[in-house]
Amino acid sequence: MANLSDKIRVSIDDLEDMLGVFGLPEFISKAENRFVRHTEEVADRVASDPKKRVVFVSGPTSSGKTTFTDRLVSQLQARGKKAVRLSLDDYYSLNALSFDEEGRPDYESVETLDMRLASIDLARLVSGDAVQTPTFDFMTRTRVESTKPAISIGKEGIVVVEGLHGLCEETTGSFDREQYLGVFIMPYASVMADSRLLDSDDIRMLRRIVRDVRHRGAHALTTIDYWPMIQNSEQDYYRDYLTKADYHVNSFLAYEPLVIASLALQDIGEALDAYEKGLLVPSVFMERSNVKKDFANIEKAVAKAKMLQVWLRQIPQAKETFVPKTSILNEFLCL
């Protein structure tokens, strides 16, 4: 069982101290190197064990699973291993949705994935076959014809499977325990003022807001309005997946509030302005709802957005141009 690694605590004073001409680049470098060391540690363990054929990477939304997985694949390849990424996001089917009491569709549960196909493809890869995986378009929320080349790892390569449900029984159950390594990735941190400002869930929400605006054609109030569904669904799986993991990777970067808070504040402000002018676009997450309304609870979302504004205005800002091109933050910034 993995244990949550040491929680990172950053104060507003710490963030202000980082902003010096020389201090910020050095602090960014230390934070990024810490994350790289996590990846290298996992890669070393997998590469040194010839029995390992699969790495399962799990974690809640906006934890950096994709970037971590891509880096891990690269690290394994650098150690002479043939390795590929298999993303469970491409196996969304959305054929049978459930809903919460306010009409939010559940896009987070394992039932929204075609786990039968994912398990077949994974088994074929491990056996040495070449596989063309499906493609899911998050803008249209539909599976589209895949144009990706087939992937293969031969008889001794490694598949790195990533997704919220990367450690579910449907994926791990076909393998002996010695054949795979489990990784649970999640930011585990708090940003402090006189009392706590932001916790780990808030940090992920801000990452998700920034990503949804830039990657998925959504505005900030859409993400905030849908967040209760994300939280409730994750609670059903969180402990089980952490228990099955061998490692917890803390994906929080100590300098990230300087960048993410600034962008999220801008995104929230634009959404609230549109709301007040009566120009707010309906939530893309409610398009498949079982009730006919544009948002699950827009009043609650607006109240949360205004609270976030108060918190985020206390955090000093740095431009996203300071973020290295290889940073996990680029998964959310779309740089």
PLM features per residue range, with description:
Residues V84-S87, S93-V144, I158:
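Conserved nucleotide-sensing/catalytic segment adjacent to the nucleotide-binding pocket
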Residues V55-V57:
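Hydrophobic anchor at the beta1->P-loop junction of P-loop NTPases
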Residues F68-L72:
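Hydrophobic positions on the alpha1 helix immediately C-terminal to the Walker A/P-loop
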Residues S62:
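Walker A (P-loop) phosphate-binding loop of P-loop NTPases
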Residues K65:
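Conserved lysine of the Walker
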Residues M1-E41:
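Charged, amphipathic alpha-helical linker segments immediately N-terminal to NTP-binding catalytic cores
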Residues S5, E26-S29, S174-L335:
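Conserved NTP phosphate-binding and transfer environment spanning the P-loop NTPase/kinase superfamily
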Residues S74-V84:
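Post-Walker A helix-loop "phosphate-sensing" segment adjacent to the P-loop in P-loop NTPases
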